[in-house]
């Protein structure tokens, strides 16, 4: 099968590799589509994701959809030809966190596309049957790649305990930020501010449901939010951009006893926070770690509200043009929202 390996920062190599038949309890899936995530771009450009350095060669990609081609011994409920989205995390199910339902912080988690665990920029993969989510014929597999990032957006709303009629500021209009805006709108947020420097993505934010959209290079975001809320601030700030300035804007824009939700992944290992307003306002600073079995809810959201969410997928490229795909996605060319490798 064809595999795209990252062998150095900004350098892919296409290889041919064999794949064993699926083991007991596993399903083999032919990968038809994989979205490029922001963390893939970090690994590609920077040689690391946060404090986790790349280990070359490595296979990125963790937003997959495809078709079942074979099943291992003991697998029931799946047959060749079934259309599926795939959860990319492998949990142990026996640590204290798994036993308490916090699978996303499993002590023994293995995440496909992390160093040492090949991801989905390849033609076939074996996975536990429990990692499959059935996709109906009515949903394009390219659109089904949104299940994984949409699950993260849904999980972030749970972590932030977002309530109907609350005010929310979303910093960053990449795919996760845009999906967060869509989820907030569908959850009944009273007013949503979105901040994004790329014009095409600001327009997408409006279509996803943002009430107010700003260019951070032209607008003092905190002043704008404070003026609109009578100097109160928002109930929750969500930092999907993960930059020093966006994190501190999120802190300054939050109301007293408000929440700051950090969904994005900072490139820097250490980021200076403005600690005084955090203490003075007694803010709750909340971190988001991927998702926690929200994939089925994400799929249902796509089926129910596809007209709003599906247009996020704007570009596709074949696997043998993966370098071109990463160049476009990383430079925000041509109005790119979500780039999908097919």
Predicted feature residues:
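Glycine-rich cofactor phosphate-binding loops and adjacent beta1-alpha1 units
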Residues: 160, 203-284
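Rossmann-fold dehydrogenase core element
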Residues: 259-261, 273-312
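C-terminal hydrophobic helical "lid"/dimerization subdomain
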Residues: 1-3, 248-252, 292-342
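Residues in the short beta-alpha loop(s) of Rossmann-like NAD(P)-binding domains
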Residues: 198, 266, 291
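NAD(P)H dinucleotide-binding glycine-rich loop of Rossmann-like/cofactor-binding domains
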Residues: 92-171
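Glycine-rich beta-strand-centered segment in the early N-terminal region that forms part
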Residues: 20-34, 49-96, 136-138
């Amino acid at each position: 099968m064809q595999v795209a390996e990252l062998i150095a920062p900004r350098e892919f190599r296409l290889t041919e590799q064999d794949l064993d038949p699926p083991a007991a309890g596993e399903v083999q899936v032919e990968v038809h589509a994989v979205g490029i995530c922001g963390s893939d771009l970090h690994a590609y450009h920077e040689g690391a994701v946060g404090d986790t350095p790349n280990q070359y060669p490595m296979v990125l990609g963790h937003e997959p959809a495809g078709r079942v081609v074979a099943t291992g011994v003991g697998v029931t409920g799946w047959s060749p030809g079934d259309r599926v989205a795939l959860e990319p995390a492998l949990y142990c199910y026996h640590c204290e966190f798994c036993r308490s339902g916090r699978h996303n912080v499993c002590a023994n988690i293995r995440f496909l596309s992390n160093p040492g665990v090949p991801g989905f920029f390849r033609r076939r993969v074996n996975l536990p049957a429990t990692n499959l989510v059935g996709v109906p014929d009515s949903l394009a597999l390219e659109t089904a790649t949104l299940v994984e990032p949409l699950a993260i957006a849904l999980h972030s709303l749970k972590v932030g305990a977002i309530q109907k009629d609350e005010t929310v500021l979303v910093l960053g209009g990449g795919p996760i930020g845009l999906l967060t805006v869509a989820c907030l709108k569908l959850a009944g947020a009273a007013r949503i501010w979105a901040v994004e420097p790329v014009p095409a993505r600001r327009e997408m934010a409006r279509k996803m449901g943002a009430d107010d959209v700003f260019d951070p290079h032209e607008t003092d975001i905190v002043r704008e939010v404070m003026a609109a809320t009578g100097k109160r601030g928002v109930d929750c700030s969500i930092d999907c951009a993960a930059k020093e300035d966006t994190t501190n804007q999120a802190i300054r824009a939050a109301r007293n006893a408000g929440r700051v939700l950090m969904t994005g992944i900072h490139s820097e290992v250490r980021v200076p926070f403005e600690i005084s307003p955090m203490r003075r306002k007694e803010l709750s600073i909340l971190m988001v770690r991927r998702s926690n079995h929200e994939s089925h809810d994400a799929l249902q959201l796509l089926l129910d509200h596809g007209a709003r969410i599906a247009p996020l997928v704007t570009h596709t490229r074949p696997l043998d043009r993966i370098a071109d795909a990463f160049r476009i996605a990383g430079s925000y060319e041509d109005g790119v929202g979500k780039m999908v490798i097919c």
